[in-house]
C-alpha cells in the first residue's frame, strides 16, 4: 500500500493516509487534512484546510491561505491583503487597503485616502489627500498639507505657513494664530506674526 501510493503515481484511495504524506504524493487528489505537512506545501495543495503555519510558503500564498499564521514576508501578495496580515514586512504598495491602515504599514507607498487615519499620521504620509483634521500633527505639517479645509488652525505650524492657511475673512477670529501668517494675512487685529517675512513684521 505504501509503495504503490507514495511513489511517482499516487492513487486517490491511499493518498490521505498518514504515512503517505510525501512530496511525491502532493497532488490535487492528496490535499487532505491528514496530508498537511511542510513537505506538501505546493501550489496544488493550497486549500483552506491545509493553511497551517507549516504551509506558509511562497507557493502557498492564496486567498484561502491568508490567515494570521500565514502572515510572513514570503506571503505578501495582493491576494493576502487582509487585516490579520498587516505586518510591517507585508506593507507593500499592493497591500494598501483600508483594512491595512496600521502604524507599521504607514509607508510612502501606502499614503492613500483610504489610509488617512490618526495612527497613520507620519511624515512620509503627508500628502494632500491625507490632510484631514485627524492628521494635522506637527509631523504632518508639510506645504502639501496646507489647505484651507484642514490647516486652520490645528495644523498651522511654522513649517506649514502658507497663504492658504491664513484666510483673510477669519484672520481676526478663528485662525488668528501667530505661527500661521503671511503678508497677505497680516491685519491690525492680529498680533505680531512669527511666521511673517521680515518686511511685514
From Swiss-Prot:
Region listing for 31 X 5 AA repeats of C-C-[GRQVIL]-[SPTR]-[VSTQPC], in residue ranges: 5-169
Sequence repeat intervals: 5-9, 20-24, 25-29, 30-34, 35-39, 40-44, 45-49, 50-54, 55-59, 60-64, 65-69, 70-74, 75-79, 80-84, 85-89, 90-94, 95-99, 100-104, 105-109, 110-114, 115-119, 120-124, 125-129, 130-134, 135-139, 140-144, 145-149, 155-159, 160-164, 165-169
Presence of keyword Repeat: yes
Tissue spec: Expressed in the hair follicles.
Annotated keywords: Keratin, Repeat
Function according to Swiss-Prot or TrEMBL: In the hair cortex, hair keratin intermediate filaments are embedded in an interfilamentous matrix, consisting of hair keratin-associated proteins (KRTAP), which are essential for the formation of a rigid and resistant hair shaft through their extensive disulfide bond cross-linking with abundant cysteine residues of hair keratins. The matrix proteins include the high-sulfur and high-glycine-tyrosine keratins.
Protein name: Keratin-associated protein 4-12
GO cellular component: cytosol; keratin filament
Pfam family, one: Keratin_B2_2
Keyword Phosphoprotein recorded: no
Family according to the record: Belongs to the KRTAP type 4 family.
Quaternary structure, from the entry: Interacts with hair keratins.
InterPro entries reported in the protein's UniProt record: KAP
Protein origin, superkingdom: Eukaryota
Amino acid at each position: 500500500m505504501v509503495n504503490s501510493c507514495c511513489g511517482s503515481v499516487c492513487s486517490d484511495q491511499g493518498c490521505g493516509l498518514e504515512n503517505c504524506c510525501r512530496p511525491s504524493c502532493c497532488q490535487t487528489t492528496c490535499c487532505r487534512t491528514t496530508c498537511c505537512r511542510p513537505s506538501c506545501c505546493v501550489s496544488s495543495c493550497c486549500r483552506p484546510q491545509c493553511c497551517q503555519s507549516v504551509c506558509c510558503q511562497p507557493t502557498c500564498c492564496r486567498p484561502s491561505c491568508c490567515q494570521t499564521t500565514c502572515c510572513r514576508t514570503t506571503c505578501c501578495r495582493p491576494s493576502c491583503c487582509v487585516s490579520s496580515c498587516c505586518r510591517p514586512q507585508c506593507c507593500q504598495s499592493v497591500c494598501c487597503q483600508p483594512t491595512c491602515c496600521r502604524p507599521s504599514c504607514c509607508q510612502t507607498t501606502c499614503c492613500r485616502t483610504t489610509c488617512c487615519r490618526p495612527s497613520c499620521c507620519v511624515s512620509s504620509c503627508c500628502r494632500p489627500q491625507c490632510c484631514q483634521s485627524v492628521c494635522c500633527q506637527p509631523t504632518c505639517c508639510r506645504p502639501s498639507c496646507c489647505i484651507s479645509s484642514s490647516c486652520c488652525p490645528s495644523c498651522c505650524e511654522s513649517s506649514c505657513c502658507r497663504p492658504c492657511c491664513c484666510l483673510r475673512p477669519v484672520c481676526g477670529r478663528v485662525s488668528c494664530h501667530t505661527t500661521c501668517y503671511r503678508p497677505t494675512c497680516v491685519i491690525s487685529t492680529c498680533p505680531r506674526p512669527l511666521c511673517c517675512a521680515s518686511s511685514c513684521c
